[in-house]
């Protein structure tokens, strides 16, 4: 069994405010390519474990859910850092969160209490590190966002254990965007 923590930028950090933004398709394609490469190595159970943030985490789950028909060994888990996560979000985002919660194979709160302190977020990070074998980050250290905290704790954890990290930076995203645009042009020509 393999377990990967998928995380990265929030949608607003990438200036993405609509689900149909072409950047979402590019990011999901990057995520699918990574997952396919991992899944094609063997038929062992493979878990995508992530959090509830709008952005990379949700897109990671959506990408995994789209691949499940072709890869029955692929499982999805959504972990909230604390109870009632997202209750302050607008209704549309709450509906999206509820929807993805109902589609995953496993869902739980790391802390059963509503938000009380930053310690719950640190506990969440520790939980994710100790319950996964590697991390996939959509993150560029030159353009820090909230993912900086996950990146730093993963770097530190890697020094103490056999934990690996794959991260996709903006240069790699740009390459994929150009390839995606070319594929779209080819489709339009036919």
From Swiss-Prot:
Domain of life of the organism encoding this protein: Bacteria
SUPFAM superfamilies for the chain: MCP/YpsA-like (SSF102405)
Family, per entry: Belongs to the UPF0398 family.
One Pfam match: YpsA
Record-given protein name: UPF0398 protein Lreu_0922
Biological source species: Limosilactobacillus reuteri (strain DSM 20016) (Lactobacillus reuteri)
HAMAP family documented for this protein: UPF0398 (MF_01575)
Transmembrane segments: none
């Amino acid at each position: 069994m393999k377990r990967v923590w998928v995380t990265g930028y929030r949608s607003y950090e990438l200036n993405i405010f609509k689900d149909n933004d072409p950047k979402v398709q590019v990011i999901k394609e990057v995520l699918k390519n990574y997952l396919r490469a991992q899944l094609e190595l063997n038929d062992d159970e493979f878990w995508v474990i992530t959090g509830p943030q709008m952005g990379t985490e949700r897109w990671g789950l959506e990408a995994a859910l789209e691949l499940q028909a072709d890869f029955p060994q692929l499982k999805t888990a959504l972990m909230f850092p604390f109870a009632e996560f997202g209750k302050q979000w607008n209704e549309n985002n709450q509906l999206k969160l509820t929807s993805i919660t109902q589609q995953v194979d496993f869902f739980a709160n790391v802390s059963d209490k509503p938000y009380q302190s930053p310690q719950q977020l640190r506990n969440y990070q520790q939980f994710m590190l100790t319950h996964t074998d590697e991390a996939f980050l959509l993150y560029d250290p030159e353009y820090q966002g909230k993912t900086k905290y996950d990146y730093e704790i993963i770097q530190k954890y890697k020094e103490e254990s056999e934990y690996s990290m794959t991260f996709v930076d903006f240069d790699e995203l740009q390459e994929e965007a150009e390839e995606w645009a070319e594929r779209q042009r080819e489709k339009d020509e036919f």
